[in-house]
């Protein structure tokens, strides 16, 4: 293409967007519009004959190995600069790996150490480039730092210890009467199971790990005692140090548990062992033989087990509450008095359990064990206790029940569920029938026996009196058998009037009079009647059991038979 002079003008082609000289612009414009076209994607001029090839090769969508889709003409730049799977070199080991894993590899690879030839220290690989600037300075800084003495760490704690001890002493001196706690060697408390437990067994986090160890505490006390004056060491007694250790061990526990366990473990004064405790005695406490109590199952030293079991025995609990002192009273030292005072002030569990209130001590009271449960009680309480003792056998109640009336003499209480209503028929006797008969028999007869009454009424009345009430003085009439026969009723009535009515009426007039008054003749029977011919001689016993009402109703038609033997009549009465 020929060069144009600088002074020659040029024009911009609207089709290809290029500057064309003015003298050739007309020819170029015609040719460009006919043969050259603009790519619709990249806006670049291409021959119209090659436009399809250009779009297919340059603007087609391709997929990178990182699964990203882009145009083919942009793939090269993406792989070189943007693809996360492109290869890169580790700056520590010159190993090629993908960019995705490069960061993790550099952290792992840079954590390796290499020995520095100048200072002789092991330096991290990732710090090798910056290490020469600080090589040798770290050792100098460590040497320049002064080591902190052990006393410097104990100074804040020593102030807290003095404050805690002063608070404890202030509370103890406020008691009335004021007294000093008896000294107790650290070895005895080390053997105590409550204080020998570890922090994990009590479920408490140790906030002061140094002070929780009694061995280290004792060593620190001996070291501080050597630097203190005799006056200062006399003030810091062993008991205050022990109280401080207890307050640290019980840190985080419930207040009730700490107070109860602490005051129960206040020892008695022992002058023989009140001296300063050595470290050897403390370590020897671990070799002591601990035996469990048979009541509370706690571990105690062998020489203290008997004393503990004596006080822990439940059978002595009521005695200690009621009496407060035995028949032989000894002189108690101030330590024991103070211990009892604190136990009564901090816990009332035994009083609540037994349901008793603390009372004044009874002087010269006699203690006698219960013969059933073995609990030792006072003489005044023993009788009432044995009467209500749970272990009292059943045979012990016979003597007490002698003066009590028996159950037979007491009115019988019947349950309403067990009582059954008696079905009452029309022909049955009323409940006051026999009482009326007896009253009539005592008063005597007013009327003589009616001539129209048969022998059967007298015999029936006698059977009823003999079966349900006491026997009367009158002579019992022989039982008669009824036979219903209406055809000869007039003849039978005449015979009875002439032969038997007189003597029988004189003997049984009161009874017959009462029956006639209670049951009139017009009372209808409650059972059906049969024909006169159906009853034979073999059914005499059945006919003899007719009720007084039925006998009175059939008295005019009844036929009296000869009396049977005395034994047969008694058998029928027993059946009634």
Curated annotation (Swiss-Prot):
<feature type="modified residue" description="Phosphoserine">
    <location>
        <position position="415"/>
    </location>
</feature>
<feature type="zinc finger region" description="TRAF-type">
    <location>
        <begin position="27"/>
        <end position="103"/>
    </location>
</feature>
<dbReference type="GO" id="GO:0008270">
    <property type="term" value="F:zinc ion binding"/>
</dbReference>
<dbReference type="Pfam" id="PF21366">
    <property type="entry name" value="TRAFD1-XIAF1_ZnF"/>
</dbReference>
<dbReference type="InterPro" id="IPR013083">
    <property type="entry name" value="Znf_RING/FYVE/PHD"/>
</dbReference>
<feature type="region of interest" description="Disordered">
    <location>
        <begin position="529"/>
        <end position="576"/>
    </location>
</feature>
<dbReference type="InterPro" id="IPR001293">
    <property type="entry name" value="Znf_TRAF"/>
</dbReference>
<feature type="modified residue" description="Phosphoserine">
    <location>
        <position position="430"/>
    </location>
</feature>
<comment type="function">
    <text>Negative feedback regulator that controls excessive innate immune responses. Regulates both Toll-like receptor 4 (TLR4) and DDX58/RIG1-like helicases (RLH) pathways. May inhibit the LTR pathway by direct interaction with TRAF6 and attenuation of NF-kappa-B activation. May negatively regulate the RLH pathway downstream from MAVS and upstream of NF-kappa-B and IRF3.</text>
</comment>
<protein>
    <recommendedName>
        <fullName>TRAF-type zinc finger domain-containing protein 1</fullName>
    </recommendedName>
</protein>
<dbReference type="GO" id="GO:0045824">
    <property type="term" value="P:negative regulation of innate immune response"/>
</dbReference>
<feature type="region of interest" description="Disordered">
    <location>
        <begin position="402"/>
        <end position="432"/>
    </location>
</feature>
<feature type="modified residue" description="Phosphoserine">
    <location>
        <position position="409"/>
    </location>
</feature>
<feature type="modified residue" description="Phosphoserine">
    <location>
        <position position="327"/>
    </location>
</feature>
<feature type="modified residue" description="Phosphoserine">
    <location>
        <position position="320"/>
    </location>
</feature>
<keyword id="KW-0007">Acetylation</keyword>
<dbReference type="GO" id="GO:0034097">
    <property type="term" value="P:response to cytokine"/>
</dbReference>
<feature type="modified residue" description="Phosphoserine">
    <location>
        <position position="450"/>
    </location>
</feature>
<comment type="subunit">
    <text>Interacts with MAVS, TICAM1, TRAF1, TRAF2, TRAF3 and TRAF6.</text>
</comment>
<dbReference type="GO" id="GO:0005739">
    <property type="term" value="C:mitochondrion"/>
</dbReference>
<keyword id="KW-0597">Phosphoprotein</keyword>
<keyword id="KW-0862">Zinc</keyword>
<feature type="compositionally biased region" description="Basic and acidic residues">
    <location>
        <begin position="411"/>
        <end position="420"/>
    </location>
</feature>
<keyword id="KW-0479">Metal-binding</keyword>
<keyword id="KW-0863">Zinc-finger</keyword>
<feature type="modified residue" description="Phosphoserine">
    <location>
        <position position="278"/>
    </location>
</feature>
<feature type="region of interest" description="Disordered">
    <location>
        <begin position="465"/>
        <end position="491"/>
    </location>
</feature>
<feature type="modified residue" description="Phosphoserine">
    <location>
        <position position="326"/>
    </location>
</feature>
<dbReference type="InterPro" id="IPR049439">
    <property type="entry name" value="TRAFD1-XIAF1_Znf"/>
</dbReference>
<dbReference type="InterPro" id="IPR051986">
    <property type="entry name" value="Innate_Immune_Apopt_Reg"/>
</dbReference>
<feature type="compositionally biased region" description="Polar residues">
    <location>
        <begin position="540"/>
        <end position="552"/>
    </location>
</feature>
<feature type="modified residue" description="N-acetylalanine">
    <location>
        <position position="2"/>
    </location>
</feature>
<feature type="modified residue" description="Phosphoserine">
    <location>
        <position position="531"/>
    </location>
</feature>
């Amino acid at each position: 293409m020929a060069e144009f002079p600088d002074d020659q003008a040029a024009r911009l082609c609207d089709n290809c967007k290029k500057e064309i000289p003015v003298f050739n612009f007309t020819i170029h414009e015609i040719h460009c519009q006919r043969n050259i076209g603009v790519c619709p994607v990249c806006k670049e001029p291409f021959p119209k004959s090659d436009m399809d090839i250009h779009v297919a090769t340059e603007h087609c969508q391709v997929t990178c190995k990182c699964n990203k889709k882009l145009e083919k003409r942009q793939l090269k730049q993406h792989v070189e600069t943007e693809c996360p799977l492109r290869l890169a070199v580790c700056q520590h080991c010159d190993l090629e790996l993908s960019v995705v894993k490069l960061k993790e590899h550099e952290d792992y690879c840079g954590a390796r150490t290499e020995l520095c030839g100048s200072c002789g220290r092991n330096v991290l690989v990732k710090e090798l480039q910056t290490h020469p600037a600080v090589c040798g300075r770290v050792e100098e800084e460590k040497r320049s730092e002064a080591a902190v003495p052990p006393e410097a760490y104990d100074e804040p704690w020593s102030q807290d210890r003095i404050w805690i001890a002063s608070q404890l002493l202030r509370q103890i001196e406020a008691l009335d009467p004021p007294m000093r706690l008896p000294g107790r060697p650290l070895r005895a408390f080390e053997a105590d199971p409550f204080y020998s437990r570890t922090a994990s067994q009590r479920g408490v986090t140790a906030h002061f790990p140094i002070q929780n160890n009694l061995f280290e505490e004792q060593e620190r006390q001996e070291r501080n005692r050597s630097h203190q004056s005799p006056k200062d060491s006399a003030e810091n007694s062993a008991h205050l140090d022990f109280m401080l250790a207890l307050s640290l061990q019980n840190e985080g526990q419930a207040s009730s548990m700490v107070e109860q366990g602490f005051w129960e473990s206040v020892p008695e004064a022992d002058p023989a062992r009140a001296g300063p405790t050595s470290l050897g005695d403390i370590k020897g406490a671990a070799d002591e033989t601990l035996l469990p109590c048979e009541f509370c199952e706690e571990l105690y030293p062998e020489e203290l087990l008997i004393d503990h079991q004596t006080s822990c025995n439940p059978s002595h609990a009521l005695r200690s509450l009621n009496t407060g002192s035995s028949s032989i009273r000894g002189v108690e030292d101030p330590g024991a008095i103070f211990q009892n005072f604190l136990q009564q002030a901090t816990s009332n569990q035994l009083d609540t359990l037994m349901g008793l209130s603390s009372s004044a001590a009874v002087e010269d009271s006699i203690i006698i064990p219960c013969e059933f449960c073995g609990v030792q009680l006072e003489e005044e309480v023993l009788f009432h206790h044995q009467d209500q003792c749970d272990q009292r056998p059943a045979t012990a109640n016979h003597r007490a029940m002698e003066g009590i009336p028996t159950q037979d003499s007491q009115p019988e209480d019947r349950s309403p569920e067990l009582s059954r209503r008696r079905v009452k028929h029309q022909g049955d006797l009323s409940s006051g029938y026999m009482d009326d008969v007896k009253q009539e028999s005592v008063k005597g007869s007013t009327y003589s026996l009616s001539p129209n009454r048969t022998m059967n009424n007298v015999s029936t009345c006698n059977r009823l009196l003999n079966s349900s009430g006491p026997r009367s003085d009158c002579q019992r009439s022989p039982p008669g058998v009824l036979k219903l026969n209406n055809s000869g009723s007039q003849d039978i009535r005449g015979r009875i009037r002439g032969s038997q009515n007189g003597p029988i009426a004189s003997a049984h007039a009161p009874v017959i009079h009462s029956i006639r008054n209670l049951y009139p003749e017009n009372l209808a029977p409650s059972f059906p009647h049969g024909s006169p011919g159906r009853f034979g001689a073999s059914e005499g016993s059945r006919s003899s059991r007719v009720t007084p009402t039925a006998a009175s109703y059939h008295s005019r038609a009844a036929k009296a038979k000869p009396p049977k033997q005395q034994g047969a009549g008694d058998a029928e009465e027993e059946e009634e």
